[in-house]
């Protein structure tokens, strides 16, 4: 991975079609903060944080590793994350990218940093459940949540590569994604790891893939709970202990089973609600969920 300083702005970087260097980026950030549109304000505030003299930005965790809290993310680590994504997805300077997520959260922030560091041509639009309805352009790369993808299936082929994160992809959406030309990836990560550190290819595979593969310079282990422990020295100073129970295939590959917080211990047999819900989805129409209730003999039992 190339060593690139966090003050670097790629010569090919564009925002909404305009060439942007560091000085212009400051001017744009101030203009966005003064703008009346909330999504532009959040972009502007983040850019000002990125361009200040500190070597870190502050962010709020999602709760993947515990109670949500404010943490400091090193700017150099964010650059390293951007380079790893570019390497994994083979993104190139002048590739067209779309920001359709709020810049308040790590996924939106990192779309901006990837564009600055990799020299992408970034379009910024208002976050919406149907983002591609707000633009007629074609793109090489975009990050979405599954809800946005599910409401954009007709237009999604206008994007070559899409990463989905922030929530799991249900079986119905995954089946529909098999028929489109877009390369779709399910991403795994959190604020503490500066967005994703592993990917699962959702479509265009010979056989269905249910395992996540590590990005460059990332390895995995498990703790005594069988929860994933992430060692990603280029983006996190210390190993990140998650509450996600996994089947560890190797030091660079795992299958996600469910959250430790949600385990149902029924007579010593551990039930993972998320896994059960995925398996019965094709048999049940409508909304449902698996939960637990007390049982005199089993201790707990799973309830639909």
Predicted regions and their residues:
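Conserved ATP-dependent adenylate/AMP-binding module captured primarily in the ANL superfamily
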Residues: 1-37, 79-101, 128-140
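Conserved pre-ATP/AMP-binding loop-to-beta segment of ANL
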Residues: 41-60, 93-94
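Conserved AMP-binding A3 loop
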Residues: 55-80, 90-92
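Conserved S/T- and glycine-rich ATP-binding loop of Class I adenylate-forming
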Residues: 61-64, 97, 112, 142, ...
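AMP-binding/adenylate-forming
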Residues: 74-80, 96-151
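Gly/Ser/Thr-rich phosphate-binding loop
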Residues: 152-205
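Conserved ATP-binding loop and adjacent catalytic segment of the adenylate-forming AMP-binding
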Residues: 183-225, 235-239
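AMP-binding/adenylate-forming catalytic core of the ANL superfamily
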Residues: 243-304
């Amino acid at each position: 991975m190339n060593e690139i300083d966090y003050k670097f702005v790629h010569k090919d970087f564009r925002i909404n079609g305009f060439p942007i260097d560091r000085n212009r980026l400051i001017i744009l950030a101030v203009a966005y903060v003064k703008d009346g549109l909330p999504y532009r304000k959040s972009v502007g505030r983040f850019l000002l944080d990125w361009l200040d003299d500190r070597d870190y930005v502050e962010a709020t965790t999602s709760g993947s590793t515990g109670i949500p809290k404010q943490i400091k993310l090193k700017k150099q680590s964010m650059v390293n994350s951007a380079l790893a994504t570019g390497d994994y997805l083979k993104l190139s300077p002048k590739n067209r990218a779309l920001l359709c997520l709020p810049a308040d959260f790590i996924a939106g922030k990192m779309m901006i940093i990837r564009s600055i560091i990799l020299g992408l041509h970034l379009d910024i639009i208002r976050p919406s459940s149907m983002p591609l309805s707000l633009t007629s352009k074609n793109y090489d790369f975009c990050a979405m949540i599954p809800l946005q993808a599910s409401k954009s299936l007709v237009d999604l082929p206008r994007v070559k590569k899409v990463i989905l994160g922030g929530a799991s992809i249900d079986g119905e959406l995954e089946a529909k994604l098999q028929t489109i030309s877009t390369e779709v990836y399910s991403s795994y990560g959190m604020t503490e790891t500066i967005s994703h550190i592993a990917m699962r290819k959702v479509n265009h595979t010979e056989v269905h893939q249910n395992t996540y593969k590590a990005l460059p310079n990332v390895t995995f282990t498990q703790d005594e709970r069988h929860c994933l422990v992430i060692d990603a020295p280029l983006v996190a100073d210390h190993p990140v202990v998650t509450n996600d129970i996994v089947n560890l295939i190797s030091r660079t590959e795992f299958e996600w089973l469910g959250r430790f917080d949600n385990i149902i211990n029924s007579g010593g047999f551990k039930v993972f609600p998320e896994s059960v819900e995925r398996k019965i989805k094709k048999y049940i129409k409508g909304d449902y969920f698996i939960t637990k209730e007390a049982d005199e003999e089993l201790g707990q039992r799973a309830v639909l």
